[in-house]
A protein has these predicted regions:
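Residues in short coils/turns that link rungs of repeat/solenoid architectures in beta-rich domains
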Residues: 22, 27, 136-137, 159, ...
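Extracellular/surface-exposed low-complexity segments
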Residues: 2-81, 270-278, 286-328
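Short, hydrophobic/proline-enriched secondary-structure or compact coil segments at domain edges
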Residues: 49-51, 108, 132
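Short linear loop/turn motifs
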Residues: 29, 142, 165, 258, ...
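The right-handed parallel beta-helix/beta-solenoid scaffold, focusing on the short coil/turn
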Residues: 9-13, 18, 42, 78, ...
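N-terminal segments that cap or nucleate solenoid repeat domains
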Residues: 53-119, 125, 326-328
Length: 328
């Protein structure tokens, strides 16, 4: 076993006239071998090769067996436990599109990282992601198609760069339920278009100094967004989207407003709102925003009919909110 990256290319173990008599009682071969006991194919998942090259009777044993096995499990559906680091972009055989066409659960059993390609995971049916692991891609970790359901119960999800000014973690056109997790991207971290229906109950949606200025976008008349909790670094509602906010913290620490509404239909009944210094908490370019509750730094955007801003200073996580909107 070695942590040196050149171990596989530098050293070779060759077995000639080798034959396995029988499996040893009580000893599992594991996922890293075929019928040859004691050989760990590789530890490519941790960023280095852990064994020498193995040649058995003139045949070089495949060091990517575990990576291929994992991809096959994803394609087959069902419960897929993640115990190890994986990078699906390492070889052509594992870097193609993976359609989720059966109910599938990706369950991170350890704090490990699954690296996927841009738009590689395409959910067409029902996908649940849970556990303490991490997923990363250059862009578009999850494509959630119309008619599909994506549920995220926990984990950390990072898009590393914006290839088209998006930097998307989830591109949603179906049903998406976010119960918890951290979502980090350099653009519209969570993007909802078409017939998207996203509900956020908790979690942290980060806008990493993006040129867009907003971590969460809802666009189009068929799009529905419901925010019940969590921390979201700014929301953009455009093109007739229907947005309901009843809780959570909505802030813009990048450059613009906590909520930008352009031809959207937004209702606010709760939550905490904080725009970038010098910018409004809520900006209405067009469309409607009915403010019927919540806490705000400023009172520059009119409350809904029958509601008023009341002085109620609160400091939460270092941000001071000066007003609460209440019924008259």
């Amino acid at each position: 076993m070695s942590k040196k990256a050149d171990t596989y290319d530098k050293y070779t173990v060759e077995l000639r006239n080798n034959k396995v008599d029988k499996q040893a009682d009580g000893v599992a071969t594991g996922y890293f071998t075929d019928e040859y006991m004691g050989w760990r194919a590789s530890n490519f998942t941790a960023g280095y090769i852990s064994t020498a090259k193995l040649i058995v009777d003139g045949v070089v044993k495949d060091r990517w067996t575990e990576l291929k096995r994992f991809v096959a499990l994803l394609k087959d559906g069902g419960n897929v436990n993640v115990w190890y680091h994986y990078d699906l972009t390492k070889i052509p055989e594992t870097s193609g599109e993976i359609p989720i066409e059966k109910p599938t659960v990706i369950d991170f059993k350890r704090a490990v990282t699954l690296t996927v390609g841009k738009q590689q995971i395409v959910n067409k049916k029902e996908l649940t992601v849970k556990g303490i692991g991490k997923m990363t891609a250059s862009d578009y970790i999850f494509m959630n198609e119309q008619g599909a359901t994506l549920t995220v119960e926990g984990g950390t999800f990072t898009a590393t760069k914006a290839t088209d000014a998006n930097g998307v973690v989830i591109y949603n056109q179906g049903i998406c339920n976010i119960k918890n997790g951290t979502f980090d991207g350099p653009g519209f971290t969570l993007m909802n278009t078409g017939s998207a229906d996203m509900t956020i109950e908790n979690g942290n949606v980060i806008n990493r100094n993006s040129p867009t200025g907003y971590a969460l976008m809802a666009a189009g008349g068929g799009t529905k967004l419901t925010v019940k909790g969590g921390r979201i670094e700014a929301i953009q509602s455009i093109g007739g989207a229907n947005v309901t906010i009843s809780g959570g913290t909505i802030l813009n620490d990048c450059k613009y407003y906590a909520l930008y509404n352009q031809n959207g239909k937004t209702t606010i009944t709760g939550g905490y709102f904080s725009g970038y210094p010098g910018m409004k908490d809520v900006y209405i370019a067009d469309g409607t925003v009915a403010i019927q509750g919540g806490y705000f730094e400023d009172n520059q955007t009119a409350a809904a009919d029958g509601y008023v801003y009341k002085d109620n200073v609160q400091t939460v996580d270092g941000i001071t909110y000066n007003y609460e909107v209440v019924a008259q």
